[in-house]
Amino acid sequence: MKDRMIESNKQIYQPIMKESNMENEKTPLYVAFSTQKGGVGKTTFTVLAASYLYYLKGYDVAVVDCDYPQHSIAGMRKRDAEQVGADEDYKRMAYEQFTRLGKKAYPVLCSSPEKAIATADEYIAAGHVPDIVFFDLPGTVNSEGVINSLAGMD
């Protein structure tokens, strides 16, 4: 039943995916939420969008956390893992959730804005081909590499 629901959702959301010209292999969609102001929810929106599409809609996603130096998403993931590791009830709940979903947490890759696209490309070249790669960029276009990273988005 779950597989049919995922396939049904993929048919609905198919327009957001792109196909490469080489043997119709899937090419990930690169997405970033950006604004020149910090503290307006870009990281929160990135996590919500990635989590919704991954856990509820069945898409394979990855997140490139290039909000250097704080790497908020990677830091949040680390704190969550530490909290789960320190509490038996959280361990049980996490195990039940991941067992029910049949998947682990989506990957979060740390990078810098100037290396963000290369980080995603290397991940994909290593054989990990998600449907969508989200990029969490700094809250200013004055940071080195932000403009070039934005130019690489779909």
Where are these regions (language model features)?
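P-loop NTP-binding core
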Residues: 1-153
